[in-house]
Every structure is written in structure tokens, then in C-alpha cells.
């Protein structure tokens, strides 16, 4: 029976051609940490990471490859982003369907003076974008919203959500 993988919001499978081979080659031929040694393999590893940062910056039209940070997974990435970016007095908007990887750090940040509001969703998983404008505040620093739900299959309207925040000093994830 053919296997059909439907949880790509969790992880990708099968991996793209060459991924397993590249990881194996790195483990077998290099296996060192970058910025931890003054020998050829360490320099090669550092160059590989720099090249990867540059490629990702170009792919996502980023301003500077030094802004690319690698983490183990999206949960860690969200924690680094939210806890590093938000300050006491900041406000965040999140969709009502956000994953615990977003909600847990935001709930923790409430004790540090960060507040958040949930943008309501209808029973079918669609986002109430008209309610979003009413929830925006002068101190809103971020809009955190999944793009596609692996629970109900809804694709949220990222472009539509971005319109009312364009030109404000905040980030949309």
C-alpha cells in the first residue's frame, strides 16, 4: 500500500532529494561545530553555514544574512522570537487557532507585562479579519498567525492580515 503523508505542518516527509546524503556526509566527513576550532574542517563547516545563511537570505529577500538564526525546531524558534523581541508594555495579536508553541510563551510573557488578544475565528476555521482592526493598539508589536492549520485545513489570509499593519512598526509572523 502506498503511504500518503499528510502532516507537513509538523514536519516534511519525505525529505527532499539529497537531504539524508548531505547530513550523512557532514557527520562522516566533518562532524565539528562552527566557531569552535582553528582547523580546516571547522573552517569548512563555518563556510557551509555562511553559504546557507546567504542562500536563505536571498530566498526570503532578507536584508542581511547575519539575521538568519538556526534552531532545532519551530517551537524553539518561536520562543527565541517572542521572548527576544517583545518587551514589557508590548501587545500582540494572535489568531484564535494558535498552537501551544505560540500560546505558552505568550502566556509566560504576560507576567513580564506583555499582553495579547486573540483574533476570533469562525466555526469553519476562517479568521475574522474585520475584528482584527478593532484589536490593533498603538503598542501592538506583532501579529502571530499560522498560515495553514494542520488541524482543520484552513489557510489563513496572510496578505489580508498584513494590510492594516503595513507601515506600522511591528512584525507579522
Residue ranges and their predicted role:
Residues 1-173:
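Pyridoxal 5′-phosphate
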Amino acid at each position: 500500500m502506498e503511504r500518503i503523508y499528510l502532516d507537513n505542518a509538523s514536519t516534511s516527509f519525505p525529505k527532499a532529494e539529497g537531504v539524508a546524503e548531505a547530513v550523512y556526509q557532514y557527520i562522516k566527513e566533518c562532524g565539528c561545530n562552527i566557531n569552535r576550532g582553528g582547523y580546516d574542517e571547522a573552517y569548512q563547516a563555518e563556510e557551509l553555514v555562511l553559504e546557507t545563511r546567504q542562500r536563505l537570505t536571498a530566498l526570503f529577500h532578507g536584508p542581511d544574512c547575519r539575521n538568519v538564526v538556526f534552531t532545532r525546531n519551530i517551537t524553539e524558534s518561536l520562543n527565541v522570537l517572542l521572548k527576544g523581541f517583545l518587551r514589557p508594555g508590548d501587545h500582540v495579536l494572535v489568531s484564535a487557532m494558535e498552537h501551544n508553541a505560540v500560546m505558552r510563551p505568550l502566556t509566560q510573557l504576560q507576567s513580564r507585562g506583555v499582553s495579547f488578544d486573540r483574533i476570533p475565528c469562525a466555526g469553519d476555521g476562517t479568521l475574522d479579519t474585520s475584528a482584527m482592526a478593532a484589536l490593533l493598539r498603538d503598542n501592538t508589536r506583532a501579529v502571530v498567525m499560522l498560515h495553514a492549520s494542520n488541524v482543520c485545513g484552513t489557510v489563513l489570509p496572510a496578505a489580508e492580515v498584513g494590510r492594516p499593519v503595513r507601515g506600522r512598526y511591528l512584525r507579522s509572523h
